[in-house]
A protein has these predicted regions:
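A short, Trp-centered hydrophobic/proline-enriched beta-strand micro-motif
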Residues: 115-123, 167, 495-507
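A short core secondary-structure module
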Residues: 145, 149-195, 522, 526-566
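A structural signal for short hydrophobic beta-strand segments in well-ordered beta-sheet cores
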Residues: 137-140, 516-517
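Glycine-rich phosphate/pyrophosphate-binding beta-alpha loops
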Residues: 77, 153-158, 204, 348-354, ...
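Internal helix-loop-helix
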Residues: 46-115, 156-163, 297, 345-346, ...
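Glycine-rich beta->alpha junctions and the first turn(s) of the following alpha-helix
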Residues: 2-6, 10-11, 77, 183, ...
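C-terminal helix-coil-helix/basic helical segment that borders enzyme active sites and/or dimer interfaces
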Residues: 24-32, 263-273, 280-315, 326-334, ...
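Glycine-rich phosphate/cofactor-binding loops in nucleotide/flavin-utilizing enzymes
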Residues: 70, 91, 329-385, 452, ...
Length: 759
């Protein structure tokens, strides 16, 4: 995601100012007239954007990919077409930078950086789109050069540009075919190149997109990229990796614009529509995934899988955001006097460009299978984590695979409380996960616990839920309790001598709401709309209840007069978690049994604790989704249909790609919220986003895993039916509560900056 480091580069502020003061005002006139924005392009040249990724030694800005993506996002927030001029040019420059000879770099890169060379890509042909290997354009050697013949389609900058990276066949007999492909830098100014026509389009107007015809066009051998034939396909693919990140950044910018327009439409409305929350979650998820891939690219890591996921998710999110904005705005949303209808027309391009999303899904699935076998290693990699955090997570992962996951099968069948697994976690010190070390705890930060909670959730949703209840109670006492309460309770909770739990209200009309009234020197509580987790196995519970329009945190102990565990709460999923319906029958509590005692906690402190609890639930949901995905990945390789493993069937590949991408987004949303640890104005909204998306992802992935397994997925002999049942607990909780969506919608409608995006 964008970090202060990315925004700190002066070019980001300069581009934002350029967009706000010049681009936004002029975009509609250029777009409706479909005229090339010469003045805006000239300004981008003045800003140095044509040399964005060209190193300073060649006259460029030398930006990293993440900062460049930030620049592209800003431009697309104002006018997506304008970014096309830069992106196509930059891809051509990157091909030379990454693959050219030293002489080619010295000769061409300064011209690309200055904008004297206006670049583009000549890849697509009338009969070869996403399948680049199907090209027919040929380059025949003649003397000291080549003669190029063929037709290229959808060339951005085709009319206004002058220097193109072109892929052609130099050996049509090569097997496999890509080994006969070479990449050339072709420059206008010679006979044999004709701009056949500019292509009329649904959107992406104002920038020229042309068909070019090459008829024995001469190209000097010095312009063969790298100086060696047969390497062109690799050269082009290396450029497309960055190109997909750029497409993702463009999509994020357009989605951000749609969010802002939808938020403006909801401004002043007493209760913003919940649909605004969906847009905000999509925008944030797309942004996080895009900058995750960009960061990997900058670190020199292989990121073709991650770049493809970013392109897929961001482009789909932009399309959905634009459509939702039109739904929200109604008639004004489709008016040509506004910009939402332009966004609606622009977004399909990003689902098609740099490889259609359907082809992208098949590539993602094949990549997952080839690179990671039966484990989604790249998406659970801990290499970038601090050593101590990594070692703890690895220890938990080993315990999960060796003991917790196998035990979960029998515990679920018997409906048995997972005491043995919990004792194993207690031995690792995880009962004191968030408790300070001087009180016997581990003092794990938010991201560390999220990693661990995901691993536990991957092994057993019930174990993850019970541990979460305990940690939630400890965290509330830590954040809200008095010094005496912390000293008395936290060491015992850390060691496991006391087990904590929470009381949460049910969304159940037949149950009475909790009523807490001031009474003498304390409070009296009545009501029966509560679930206690983990029921009979907890010693102390924490309840948040409203008193005089503010929340108070109450401590209730098992055996407290008026506090009754009424009956077991049997559920489809998370069997054995020992949930109980409870009743408060005039339960009288002195002030000493409120967290903080006489000093009531602030609303911000309570909101922070609630946010962190939602993050812990999100992390466990990601783990559940991960388990279901791994099961599907294994089964798809083991099961055959029509003579081949079902993972080779496109329908299965599309599902695997969507499942993996959704999990990656859920994990990134969760880790972002975990890093905030409930602190900051945006933390509650970010935690809610993570919670909602992770819960929906767990449901989607468990269901899709069942589809892939077929009848076996419905059978109790396979774990998938348990995963699907466990997902129901997530939907029945806060994730199904519209109040949580409305809180996100209010955050978006208020114009809060979402992860670096413009307000």
């Amino acid at each position: 995601m964008p970090t202060p480091l990315h925004d700190a580069h002066p070019i980001v502020a300069a581009v934002r100012q350029f967009v706000d003061k010049e681009v936004v005002l002029a975009a509609s006139s250029f777009e409706h007239a479909d005229t090339y924005p010469h003045d805006l392009v000239a300004r981008m040249r003045e800003l140095g954007l044509f040399g964005s990724l060209v190193p300073a030694e060649y006259g460029g800005l030398g930006l990293d990919v993440a900062t460049y993506a930030r620049v592209i996002e800003e431009i697309c927030r104002g006018f997506m077409s304008l970014a096309g001029v830069i992106n196509s040019h930059t891809m051509a420059a990157l091909i030379v930078l990454q693959n050219g000879t030293d002489e080619q770099k010295r000769r061409l890169l300064p011209r690309f950086a200055s904008g004297a060379a206006r670049g583009g890509l000549c890849l697509t042909e009338p009969h070869a789109g996403s399948d680049v290997q199907a090209i027919r354009t040929v380059a025949k050697r003649q003397g000291d050069g080549y003669l190029i013949s063929g037709s290229k389609m959808f060339v951005t900058n085709g009319r206004e540009g002058n220097t193109f990276a072109l892929l052609a066949l130099t050996d049509a007999s090569a097997k496999p075919r890509y080994r006969g492909m070479s990449c050339f830098i072709v420059e206008k100014g010679h006979a044999g190149l004709q701009v056949v026509k500019s292509i009329a389009k649904l959107g992406y107007k104002g920038v020229d997109t042309a068909e070019l015809l090459f008829d024995s066009f001469p190209c000097p051998a010095d312009n063969l990229v790298g100086g060696v034939e047969g390497r062109g396909f690799k050269h082009v693919m290396s450029g497309l990796e960055a190109g997909r990140i750029n497409i993702a950044a463009r999509a994020v910018g357009v989605a951000q614009a749609a969010l802002e327009e939808a938020a403006r439409g909801a401004h002043g409305v007493a209760e913003p529509p919940a649909a605004l929350a969906s847009i905000a979650i999509r925008v944030d998820g797309a942004r996080l995934l895009t900058y995750w891939a960009a960061g990997m690219k900058d670190r020199g890591e292989r990121c073709d899988l991650e770049a493809g996921m970013a392109k897929l998710h961001a482009s789909e999110s932009a399309q959905e955001a634009a459509a939702d904005a039109i739904r929200m705005l109604g008639g004004p949303g489709q008016a040509t006097s506004g910009i939402v209808e332009r966004l609606y027309r622009d977004t399909p391009l990003m689902m098609i460009g740099e490889g259609t999303n359907e082809i992208q899904r098949t590539i993602i699935a094949k990549n997952l299978l080839q690179r990671h076998g039966e484990r989604l290693g790249a998406l659970t990699s801990l290499e970038a984590e601090p050593e101590e955090r990594r070692q703890m997570a690895l220890a938990v992962r080993q315990l999960v695979e060796r003991e917790i996951a196998p035990a979960a099968v029998e515990d679920d069948r018997a409906g048995r409380f997972p005491s043995v697994s919990l004792d194993k976690l207690k031995a690792l010190g995880l009962f004191g996960a968030v408790i300070p070390q001087d009180m016997g705890g581990l003092n794990l930060d938010g991201p560390a616990y999220a990693l661990i909670a995901e691993e536990i959730g991957r092994g057993s949703a019930s174990v993850a839920a019970v541990l979460k209840d305990h940690v939630d109670a400890a965290d509330l006492i830590l954040r809200l309790g008095s010094a005496e309460q912390r000293q008395r309770l936290l060491p015992a909770l850390a060691s496991g001598k006391l087990r904590g739990g929470t009381l949460r209200r049910l969304r159940e009309p037949a149950r009475r709401e909790i009523n807490a009234l001031s009474h003498a020197d304390g409070f009296i509580l009545t009501g029966d709309g509560l679930i206690a987790g983990p029921g009979r196995h907890a010693d102390v519970f924490v309840l948040l209840a409203p008193v005089d329009e503010r929340l108070i945190a109450f401590l209730l102990e098992v055996g407290q007069p008026g506090f009754v565990l009424a009956e077991p709460f049997e559920t489809a999923g998370r069997r054995g978690a020992d949930l109980w319906h409870t009743q408060l029958r005039g339960c009288v509590l002195p002030s000493s049994q409120t967290l903080g005692g006489e000093v009531a906690p602030t609303s911000a402190a309570i909101a922070g604790a609630q946010a962190s609890a939602r993050v812990r639930e999100a992390a466990a949901a990601v783990g559940l989704a991960q388990a279901a995905f791994e099961a599907a990945l294994r089964y798809s390789q083991q099961r055959s249909a029509f003579g081949v493993p079902i993972c080779q069937h496109q329908a299965i590949q599309l599902k695997l790609a969507d499942m993996a991408t959704a999990i990656a987004v859920a994990r990134l949303l969760t880790q972002r919220a975990a890093a905030e640890d409930g602190a900051g104005d945006a933390a509650p909204a970010h935690a809610a986003m993570a919670h909602l998306h992770a819960a929906e992802t767990a449901y989607m992935v468990t269901l899709e895993s069942m589809r892939i397994h077929g009848g076996y997925g419905y059978s109790a002999e396979f774990p998938v039916e348990r995963y699907y049942r466990d997902a129901s607990a997530l939907l029945a909780g806060e994730a199904g509560d519209e109040a949580l969506r409305r809180s996100i919608a209010r955050h978006a409608a208020a114009g809060a900056t979402l992860d670096g995006g413009p307000a």
